[in-house]
Amino acid sequence: MQYNKRFVAEKGYEKYITNKYPDKKIAILSCMDTRLTALLPAALGIKNGDVKMIKNAGGIISHPFGSVIRSLMVAIYELGVTEVMVIAHSDCGACHMSSAQMIEHMKARGIKQETIDMIRFCGVDFESWLYGFEDTEKSVKRYGGSYYQSSADTE
């Protein structure tokens, strides 16, 4: 917080000022991997204000009515995005992710079995929800390729 206070006081934000509309009219769905924070924009030649960046574990669309689709809808229908890119990377932590192992990690960090059981009772299928993917290229095709086409692509 001290850094942020100094940043604001010194007006460090001024060089980042832009509006909410992406200059390149692109939305990018990518992984939240820390290695991509600076690497992905550098590799694509994008800067602050160019694109709408949506990040999650694995860069996947895990539910047709989830937050990724909602974010893409806002980007497209409210903010002028005309192109969506789904970008994966090598050595992704979500690849080969085990739902059973993650549940064990949750328990080790204090989540009680009764909490997990209650969530399952509410309809959450932990096994499929927490499962990663086996193949990066197939994941991009499934979660970002022909699986989700706009009506303009199918006419």
What residue spans do the PLM features occupy?
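Short, charged/polar surface micro-motifs in flexible loops or helix N-caps
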Residues: 33-35
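A short beta-strand-loop structural module common to alpha/beta enzyme folds
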Residues: 51-58
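Divalent-metal-activated hydrolytic enzyme cores
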Residues: 1-24, 59-68, 76-81, 92-155
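A common structural microfeature
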Residues: 23-26, 48-51
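Short beta-strand segments
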Residues: 29-31, 55, 87-89
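Short Gly/aromatic-enriched secondary-structure transition segments
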Residues: 41-46
